């Protein structure tokens, strides 16, 4: 599904920041038809029950623990406080450390003893996934909850000028301030989970920091969420090896390219 909605239809309270998520639901009951047909082997009825939920990518797949994945799928964002420990104390960084510490050290040269960030609880991940960034896409009186937040007041970046790394690469119109088709959300999420926000980021001028000048050292700021020593692997360019770029996509709504056609013989 792709919807194009005027901003004025979404900005009811005037602060310009929205949060969104999608859900899928199925009827509560399935009854086997004693005289089934190919088209209808069963009957469905009862209230619709939420089966899945999605906003930011990979949250349920990689952040929420196995015992609570079904609970997350059935929950509303107002219930996310019960699942916050998966964000504040995630297991994914430890898994990535086990899998990739030796390759990182042998490829990049450093002798990192542990790739996993040590700043527990992870305030940087609470900001990235549950509240949004102050001054960018965090609304007033925000309640920590997992949703895709967007500051509609940030001008859209022209397609040819977009950075696939979004906010962390000085493109405030990109992920996690919303999500564009050309944002490399997997690479961004990997780097944030491994502590990229503990290191200085070139956002001083973009966020209006006094004295910050674009393309100078003054543009590098610490967001105050954690410190570089908390994340030895925070500058490692983690990637899934599947790059994407807005220039590969259409420049008109809905922007996504047509799917590759399947075999005509199937």
Where are these regions (language model features)?
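Surface-exposed extracytoplasmic segments
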Residues: 1-266
